[in-house]
């Protein structure tokens, strides 16, 4: 297991030890006239710095101090010395965080200070990120991972594996875009991204892997891949096209509708919210109110209007972008309704990169012809257990 892949798990375990031992967050020595420092920890990234500077320029009572970690060893040393930050902007496993008590539940503050205000977060995103009634982190921006399906076979968002299998068997269509035909790893990465979401539950202390359901799911993709590789199909229109939606002006390709990835019976539609880093507040912090004030600032319309490389999490700013594109005739009313439907019916949240990497390596071996589906499932189950055991040592 690569050390970088253990970052999320390491932070969770190290903070758990620190909070249990009664350590408090670290602040530098402050003079009587100096404003209090509230520390924000980030990993190898200072893109939040302009926002920090803008906040500090209007704040006299306290200042946000950015702590940039560029090595795992440094973070380990700081944490073991009891110098954890008040809040973090990191990429951590949302469901695993919910299983622990290391972070402040942000939902009461969201309900009290954000709901029905200009800083309100996209409700569908909050609902998806709420696990066991708790909200442990809020992203700065987001995108949606989904699939487009041929409209002549699918009528809208949410398709079952049975429906997709029926369409694949009844019609001579390639399952993937033709240009992907020789790109096994490309295919494997898409299947891996949703497999880690659909079949792994880390919201409890013990991971739950739905092994038999995963085997059925992987077999569907493998069967379609084998047929596409071995036959000359007289069509260049793929049955399904995996895609990411990073702006509300991205309607489906002509002849397609947003369907999400196929899912098994009783599962929600197969689209998911994706984001990189997200804000979280350490439960042992003495500056929870101040940390939340900074998060609120980051969610304000003024800050969210500058979001690029994804969609703003501020619901009013997101609606502004939709209205602007409608006014400029960049999208139609039907396109806007299609996006609203996709947003409204997205319930999953992207899996931890640690989990996705495990699936990707084993699934890639299947698509390359080096492993059978049942063998890949066993390997994934073993590696998931090993990953959790290794994580527990930190």
Positions of PLM-derived features:
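Conserved N-terminal structural module of periplasmic/extracytoplasmic solute-binding proteins
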Residues: 1-4, 20-95, 306, 375, ...
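Bacterial N-terminal signal peptides
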Residues: 9-19
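Short helices/loops that flank or line small-molecule/ion binding pockets
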Residues: 73-88, 95, 220-251, 361, ...
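Hinge/lid segment of periplasmic solute-binding proteins
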Residues: 91-146, 257-266
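Extracytoplasmic/periplasmic solute-binding protein
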Residues: 136-140, 145, 163-209, 236
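Glycine-centered hinge/linker elements that transmit conformational signals in sensory
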Residues: 202-231
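Extracytoplasmic/periplasmic substrate-recognition and gating elements
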Residues: 252-314
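Long, aromatic- and glycine/proline-rich binding clefts that accommodate carbohydrate-like moieties
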Residues: 309-365, 390-394
